Amino acid sequence: MRKRKFAFAASMLAVSTLVLAACSDVEEGGATTDTGGGGTNAAAQCAGDPITIAVNPWVGAEANAAVAQAVMQNEMGCTVELQEINESGQFPAMASGDVDATLEVWPSGHLKDRRDYIEKAGDVVDGGELGITGNIGWFMPSYLVEENPDLATWEGFKENADAFATAETGDKGRFLGADTTYSIFDEAIIASLGLDLEVVYSGSEAASLAALDKAYNSQEPILMYWWTPQWANAKYDLVEVELPAYNEECGAIAAEDPDAAVGYNCDYAEDVLYKAFSAGLETKDPAAFEFFSNFTWTEEDQNAVALSIQEGTDPAEAAQAWIDENADVVEGWLPAPS
Protein backbone atom coordinates (compact mmCIF):
# COMPACT_ATOMS: atom_id res chain seq x y z
CA MET A 1 0.00 0.00 0.00
CA ARG A 2 0.48 3.82 0.05
CA LYS A 3 1.60 7.23 -1.25
CA ARG A 4 2.62 10.83 -1.05
CA LYS A 5 1.53 12.32 -4.35
CA PHE A 6 3.75 14.01 -6.90
CA ALA A 7 2.86 15.85 -10.09
CA PHE A 8 2.02 13.42 -12.86
CA ALA A 9 4.93 14.43 -15.05
CA ALA A 10 7.37 13.79 -12.25
CA SER A 11 5.79 10.54 -11.19
CA MET A 12 5.81 9.14 -14.67
CA LEU A 13 9.57 9.54 -14.81
CA ALA A 14 9.62 6.80 -12.19
CA VAL A 15 7.34 4.53 -14.19
CA SER A 16 8.99 1.42 -15.51
CA THR A 17 7.01 -0.56 -18.05
CA LEU A 18 7.20 -4.31 -18.03
CA VAL A 19 5.76 -5.42 -21.34
CA LEU A 20 4.98 -8.97 -20.47
CA ALA A 21 2.86 -10.30 -23.30
CA ALA A 22 0.41 -12.71 -21.79
CA CYS A 23 1.57 -15.37 -24.19
CA SER A 24 5.20 -14.98 -23.11
CA ASP A 25 7.43 -15.56 -20.11
CA VAL A 26 10.51 -13.41 -19.49
CA GLU A 27 13.77 -15.33 -19.30
CA GLU A 28 17.19 -14.18 -18.12
CA GLY A 29 18.65 -11.50 -20.34
CA GLY A 30 15.21 -10.08 -21.18
CA ALA A 31 14.40 -12.61 -23.92
CA THR A 32 10.87 -13.97 -24.24
CA THR A 33 9.56 -17.38 -25.14
CA ASP A 34 6.15 -18.27 -26.50
CA THR A 35 4.06 -20.22 -24.02
CA GLY A 36 1.10 -20.82 -26.26
CA GLY A 37 -1.74 -18.69 -24.89
CA GLY A 38 -4.80 -18.48 -27.07
CA GLY A 39 -7.34 -19.23 -24.36
CA THR A 40 -9.48 -22.29 -23.80
CA ASN A 41 -12.64 -20.90 -25.44
CA ALA A 42 -14.51 -21.83 -22.24
CA ALA A 43 -14.74 -18.11 -21.50
CA ALA A 44 -15.32 -14.98 -23.54
CA GLN A 45 -12.15 -14.09 -25.40
CA CYS A 46 -10.32 -10.77 -25.37
CA ALA A 47 -10.76 -8.44 -28.33
CA GLY A 48 -7.11 -8.50 -29.38
CA ASP A 49 -5.53 -5.22 -28.32
CA PRO A 50 -3.11 -5.46 -25.37
CA ILE A 51 -4.57 -4.91 -21.92
CA THR A 52 -2.37 -2.97 -19.49
CA ILE A 53 -2.53 -3.55 -15.73
CA ALA A 54 -0.90 -1.14 -13.27
CA VAL A 55 1.46 -2.73 -10.75
CA ASN A 56 2.12 -0.61 -7.66
CA PRO A 57 5.37 -1.00 -5.68
CA TRP A 58 4.35 -3.60 -3.11
CA VAL A 59 4.19 -7.36 -3.39
CA GLY A 60 0.43 -7.65 -2.83
CA ALA A 61 -0.20 -5.57 -5.96
CA GLU A 62 2.27 -7.77 -7.82
CA ALA A 63 0.30 -10.84 -6.70
CA ASN A 64 -2.98 -9.36 -7.97
CA ALA A 65 -1.52 -8.60 -11.37
CA ALA A 66 0.30 -11.92 -11.77
CA VAL A 67 -2.83 -13.96 -11.10
CA ALA A 68 -5.01 -11.79 -13.34
CA GLN A 69 -2.46 -11.96 -16.15
CA ALA A 70 -2.15 -15.75 -15.96
CA VAL A 71 -5.91 -16.32 -16.04
CA MET A 72 -6.47 -13.86 -18.88
CA GLN A 73 -3.64 -15.46 -20.84
CA ASN A 74 -4.68 -19.06 -20.40
CA GLU A 75 -8.45 -18.76 -20.37
CA MET A 76 -9.25 -15.71 -22.47
CA GLY A 77 -6.46 -15.48 -25.05
CA CYS A 78 -5.47 -12.00 -23.92
CA THR A 79 -2.24 -10.14 -24.41
CA VAL A 80 -1.49 -8.46 -21.08
CA GLU A 81 1.12 -5.85 -20.28
CA LEU A 82 2.12 -5.19 -16.68
CA GLN A 83 3.21 -1.62 -16.05
CA GLU A 84 5.09 -0.75 -12.88
CA ILE A 85 3.81 2.63 -11.77
CA ASN A 86 3.71 4.69 -8.59
CA GLU A 87 0.32 5.15 -6.97
CA SER A 88 0.45 8.84 -7.81
CA GLY A 89 0.62 8.10 -11.52
CA GLN A 90 -2.03 5.44 -11.91
CA PHE A 91 -5.15 7.62 -12.05
CA PRO A 92 -3.73 10.00 -14.70
CA ALA A 93 -2.54 6.96 -16.66
CA MET A 94 -6.00 5.40 -16.60
CA ALA A 95 -7.59 8.72 -17.54
CA SER A 96 -5.37 8.94 -20.62
CA GLY A 97 -5.91 5.28 -21.54
CA ASP A 98 -2.24 4.38 -21.10
CA VAL A 99 -3.29 1.97 -18.34
CA ASP A 100 -6.51 -0.03 -18.51
CA ALA A 101 -6.88 -1.16 -14.90
CA THR A 102 -5.46 -1.06 -11.42
CA LEU A 103 -6.55 -3.88 -9.15
CA GLU A 104 -5.81 -2.38 -5.72
CA VAL A 105 -6.71 1.18 -4.75
CA TRP A 106 -6.34 2.20 -1.10
CA PRO A 107 -9.10 4.82 -0.86
CA SER A 108 -7.80 6.78 2.15
CA GLY A 109 -4.96 8.11 0.01
CA HIS A 110 -7.01 8.60 -3.15
CA LEU A 111 -9.99 10.69 -2.03
CA LYS A 112 -8.91 13.55 -4.29
CA ASP A 113 -8.25 11.19 -7.21
CA ARG A 114 -11.67 9.63 -6.79
CA ARG A 115 -13.31 13.05 -6.76
CA ASP A 116 -11.34 14.40 -9.73
CA TYR A 117 -11.16 11.37 -12.03
CA ILE A 118 -14.19 9.24 -11.16
CA GLU A 119 -16.85 11.61 -9.83
CA LYS A 120 -16.07 14.78 -11.81
CA ALA A 121 -14.29 13.95 -15.07
CA GLY A 122 -15.65 10.43 -15.45
CA ASP A 123 -12.58 9.22 -17.35
CA VAL A 124 -11.89 6.56 -14.69
CA VAL A 125 -14.56 4.20 -13.36
CA ASP A 126 -14.90 2.38 -10.05
CA GLY A 127 -14.37 -1.33 -10.76
CA GLY A 128 -15.86 -2.68 -7.54
CA GLU A 129 -14.33 -4.05 -4.38
CA LEU A 130 -11.26 -6.29 -4.46
CA GLY A 131 -12.54 -8.31 -1.51
CA ILE A 132 -9.91 -7.16 0.99
CA THR A 133 -10.13 -4.56 3.75
CA GLY A 134 -6.83 -2.82 4.41
CA ASN A 135 -5.55 -0.82 7.32
CA ILE A 136 -2.65 1.64 7.43
CA GLY A 137 -1.25 2.80 10.73
CA TRP A 138 1.64 3.03 13.17
CA PHE A 139 3.01 -0.37 14.12
CA MET A 140 5.70 -1.69 16.45
CA PRO A 141 6.77 -5.10 17.76
CA SER A 142 4.66 -6.39 20.65
CA TYR A 143 7.70 -6.74 22.91
CA LEU A 144 7.91 -2.93 23.12
CA VAL A 145 4.37 -2.61 24.45
CA GLU A 146 4.95 -5.47 26.86
CA GLU A 147 7.93 -3.56 28.27
CA ASN A 148 6.13 -0.19 28.30
CA PRO A 149 2.31 -0.37 28.04
CA ASP A 150 2.12 3.43 27.60
CA LEU A 151 3.34 2.94 24.03
CA ALA A 152 0.03 1.32 23.11
CA THR A 153 -1.36 4.80 22.37
CA TRP A 154 0.03 7.94 20.76
CA GLU A 155 -0.01 9.72 24.11
CA GLY A 156 2.75 7.41 25.33
CA PHE A 157 5.10 9.01 22.84
CA LYS A 158 4.87 12.38 24.57
CA GLU A 159 7.31 11.06 27.17
CA ASN A 160 8.95 8.13 25.38
CA ALA A 161 9.78 9.34 21.87
CA ASP A 162 13.49 9.50 22.65
CA ALA A 163 13.55 5.72 23.14
CA PHE A 164 13.30 5.50 19.34
CA ALA A 165 16.10 8.00 18.67
CA THR A 166 18.89 7.10 16.25
CA ALA A 167 22.13 8.75 15.17
CA GLU A 168 20.21 10.11 12.19
CA THR A 169 17.42 11.70 14.23
CA GLY A 170 19.43 12.94 17.23
CA ASP A 171 17.22 13.67 20.24
CA LYS A 172 14.04 12.93 18.31
CA GLY A 173 12.59 9.49 17.96
CA ARG A 174 12.70 7.91 14.53
CA PHE A 175 9.43 7.12 12.80
CA LEU A 176 10.20 4.81 9.90
CA GLY A 177 8.21 5.77 6.83
CA ALA A 178 8.11 3.63 3.72
CA ASP A 179 8.21 4.41 0.00
CA THR A 180 7.66 8.16 -0.42
CA THR A 181 5.11 7.47 -3.16
CA TYR A 182 2.76 5.70 -0.73
CA SER A 183 -0.27 7.32 0.92
CA ILE A 184 1.46 8.92 3.90
CA PHE A 185 0.12 11.48 6.40
CA ASP A 186 2.59 10.78 9.20
CA GLU A 187 4.49 14.08 9.11
CA ALA A 188 1.18 15.91 9.48
CA ILE A 189 0.00 13.57 12.27
CA ILE A 190 3.25 14.02 14.21
CA ALA A 191 3.14 17.82 13.83
CA SER A 192 -0.54 18.04 14.76
CA LEU A 193 -0.12 15.88 17.87
CA GLY A 194 3.07 17.67 18.92
CA LEU A 195 5.20 14.54 19.14
CA ASP A 196 8.99 14.62 19.21
CA LEU A 197 9.35 12.23 16.27
CA GLU A 198 11.06 12.58 12.91
CA VAL A 199 9.98 10.67 9.81
CA VAL A 200 12.79 8.84 8.02
CA TYR A 201 11.71 7.17 4.78
CA SER A 202 12.99 3.67 4.09
CA GLY A 203 12.35 4.03 0.36
CA SER A 204 10.59 0.73 -0.26
CA GLU A 205 8.57 -2.10 1.22
CA ALA A 206 11.67 -4.31 1.09
CA ALA A 207 13.77 -1.76 2.99
CA SER A 208 11.11 -1.40 5.68
CA LEU A 209 11.01 -5.17 6.06
CA ALA A 210 14.79 -5.32 6.37
CA ALA A 211 14.72 -2.68 9.11
CA LEU A 212 11.92 -4.49 10.91
CA ASP A 213 13.72 -7.82 10.70
CA LYS A 214 16.93 -6.33 12.08
CA ALA A 215 15.17 -4.62 14.97
CA TYR A 216 12.99 -7.63 15.73
CA ASN A 217 15.87 -10.07 15.86
CA SER A 218 17.77 -7.75 18.21
CA GLN A 219 14.67 -6.80 20.25
CA GLU A 220 15.39 -3.14 19.48
CA PRO A 221 12.87 -0.26 19.33
CA ILE A 222 11.21 0.45 15.99
CA LEU A 223 8.08 2.48 15.16
CA MET A 224 6.94 2.34 11.58
CA TYR A 225 4.32 3.03 8.94
CA TRP A 226 2.83 -0.36 8.15
CA TRP A 227 -0.34 -1.98 6.93
CA THR A 228 -2.56 -5.01 6.72
CA PRO A 229 -2.93 -7.22 4.80
CA GLN A 230 0.76 -7.97 4.51
CA TRP A 231 2.31 -11.44 4.40
CA ALA A 232 4.98 -10.49 6.99
CA ASN A 233 2.33 -9.93 9.66
CA ALA A 234 2.23 -13.69 10.14
CA LYS A 235 5.98 -13.70 10.81
CA TYR A 236 6.28 -10.74 13.19
CA ASP A 237 4.09 -10.10 16.23
CA LEU A 238 3.19 -6.45 15.68
CA VAL A 239 0.95 -4.08 17.61
CA GLU A 240 -0.79 -1.06 16.13
CA VAL A 241 -0.48 2.18 18.07
CA GLU A 242 -3.83 3.73 18.92
CA LEU A 243 -4.11 7.15 17.25
CA PRO A 244 -7.03 9.60 17.59
CA ALA A 245 -10.01 8.15 15.76
CA TYR A 246 -10.45 8.99 12.09
CA ASN A 247 -13.07 11.66 11.48
CA GLU A 248 -14.69 13.63 8.67
CA GLU A 249 -12.39 16.61 9.19
CA CYS A 250 -9.34 14.44 8.51
CA GLY A 251 -11.09 13.03 5.47
CA ALA A 252 -11.72 16.53 4.13
CA ILE A 253 -8.05 17.45 4.61
CA ALA A 254 -6.91 14.29 2.81
CA ALA A 255 -9.30 14.95 -0.06
CA GLU A 256 -8.29 18.59 -0.49
CA ASP A 257 -4.52 18.48 -0.01
CA PRO A 258 -3.15 14.92 0.28
CA ASP A 259 0.43 16.10 -0.31
CA ALA A 260 0.79 18.34 2.75
CA ALA A 261 -2.31 17.27 4.74
CA VAL A 262 -1.76 20.20 7.12
CA GLY A 263 -3.87 19.73 10.24
CA TYR A 264 -4.41 16.00 9.75
CA ASN A 265 -4.44 14.78 13.35
CA CYS A 266 -6.06 11.36 13.40
CA ASP A 267 -5.68 7.74 12.38
CA TYR A 268 -5.85 6.52 8.80
CA ALA A 269 -9.30 5.52 7.58
CA GLU A 270 -10.18 1.87 7.17
CA ASP A 271 -9.58 1.01 3.53
CA VAL A 272 -12.03 -1.18 1.64
CA LEU A 273 -9.77 -1.84 -1.33
CA TYR A 274 -11.28 -1.36 -4.76
CA LYS A 275 -10.38 -1.66 -8.42
CA ALA A 276 -10.46 1.13 -10.99
CA PHE A 277 -10.50 1.05 -14.79
CA SER A 278 -10.08 3.41 -17.69
CA ALA A 279 -13.51 4.61 -18.77
CA GLY A 280 -12.75 3.36 -22.28
CA LEU A 281 -12.01 -0.22 -21.25
CA GLU A 282 -15.57 -1.52 -21.50
CA THR A 283 -15.75 -0.44 -25.14
CA LYS A 284 -12.18 -1.45 -25.94
CA ASP A 285 -12.54 -4.97 -24.55
CA PRO A 286 -15.84 -6.04 -22.96
CA ALA A 287 -14.46 -9.43 -21.90
CA ALA A 288 -11.49 -7.89 -20.08
CA PHE A 289 -13.80 -5.36 -18.43
CA GLU A 290 -16.08 -8.13 -17.18
CA PHE A 291 -13.16 -10.23 -15.95
CA PHE A 292 -11.68 -7.35 -13.95
CA SER A 293 -15.12 -6.52 -12.55
CA ASN A 294 -15.49 -10.13 -11.39
CA PHE A 295 -11.96 -10.36 -9.96
CA THR A 296 -12.18 -10.61 -6.17
CA TRP A 297 -10.23 -12.62 -3.64
CA THR A 298 -9.43 -12.74 0.05
CA GLU A 299 -6.57 -11.50 2.19
CA GLU A 300 -5.50 -15.12 2.65
CA ASP A 301 -5.47 -15.68 -1.12
CA GLN A 302 -3.36 -12.61 -1.78
CA ASN A 303 -0.96 -13.34 1.07
CA ALA A 304 -0.37 -16.88 -0.21
CA VAL A 305 0.78 -15.62 -3.61
CA ALA A 306 2.63 -12.61 -2.18
CA LEU A 307 4.61 -14.74 0.28
CA SER A 308 5.61 -17.13 -2.50
CA ILE A 309 6.85 -14.20 -4.60
CA GLN A 310 8.67 -12.71 -1.61
CA GLU A 311 10.44 -16.02 -1.04
CA GLY A 312 11.82 -15.94 -4.58
CA THR A 313 9.28 -17.76 -6.71
CA ASP A 314 8.76 -16.26 -10.15
CA PRO A 315 5.47 -14.30 -10.01
CA ALA A 316 4.00 -16.25 -12.93
CA GLU A 317 4.82 -19.55 -11.22
CA ALA A 318 3.45 -18.36 -7.88
CA ALA A 319 0.26 -17.24 -9.60
CA GLN A 320 -0.19 -20.51 -11.48
CA ALA A 321 0.31 -22.59 -8.33
CA TRP A 322 -2.49 -20.65 -6.63
CA ILE A 323 -4.72 -20.92 -9.71
CA ASP A 324 -4.25 -24.69 -9.83
CA GLU A 325 -5.45 -24.95 -6.22
CA ASN A 326 -8.40 -22.56 -6.62
CA ALA A 327 -10.12 -23.47 -9.88
CA ASP A 328 -13.56 -22.79 -8.41
CA VAL A 329 -12.63 -19.21 -7.53
CA VAL A 330 -11.10 -18.61 -10.96
CA GLU A 331 -14.19 -19.98 -12.70
CA GLY A 332 -16.27 -17.30 -11.01
CA TRP A 333 -14.12 -14.58 -12.58
CA LEU A 334 -14.48 -15.74 -16.17
CA PRO A 335 -16.91 -13.94 -18.47
CA ALA A 336 -19.32 -16.27 -20.22
CA PRO A 337 -18.70 -16.76 -23.95
CA SER A 338 -21.10 -14.86 -26.17
Model-found features: residue ranges?
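C-terminal motif of bacterial Sec signal peptides marking the signal peptidase cleavage site
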Residues: 17-22
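A conserved helix-loop-strand patch within extracytoplasmic ligand-binding domains
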Residues: 122-175
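An extracytoplasmic/periplasmic, membrane-proximal ligand-sensing/linker region
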Residues: 49, 60, 182-198, 202-219, ...
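Ligand-binding pocket segment of bilobal, Venus flytrap-like solute-binding proteins
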Residues: 93, 100-104, 174-252
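Bacterial signal peptide processing site
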Residues: 24-27
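Pocket-flanking alpha-helical
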Residues: 65, 83-121, 210-213, 231-236
